[in-house]
Amino acid sequence: MKETYFEGQVIREQKIQSETMEYFKFIDCDFENCSFEDCKIINCTFENCKFYNCNIVSLSAQYSEIKNAEFKKCNLIGIHWGGLLPSGKYARALEKIENCYLKYNTFSDMNLKKFDFSGNIIQDSLFDELIYLIPPRIQLILRII
């Protein structure tokens, strides 16, 4: 199947619900005020993309990857991030998650060294089998919760 390719695009105000996206590649794209709800992505790549004020809810992924993504002021609900890991020894799925609301997320089998979750609201999420340096301040908060 032929891949649909986007590079350097700004994608605004798109609402995609209960759809399957196959063979899309987004390089250096910005997503602003977009919504992806109950979507399935198959053989898709998001590389060096930024998401601002987006809702991503119950995303299902197969053979897809995110590389060096940034999320700011987003609602990220029901995402299994381990299923979106990029190939390559030094590739990073997430560059930054800032001022976001995360609920029912699963972070597993990921290298999150040097990653900072401060400034985000995280509820009912799982962190498993990670390589991660948790700052002492966050360790204290996690013990209280």
Per-segment meaning from a language model:
Residues 1-145:
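Tandem repeat scaffolds
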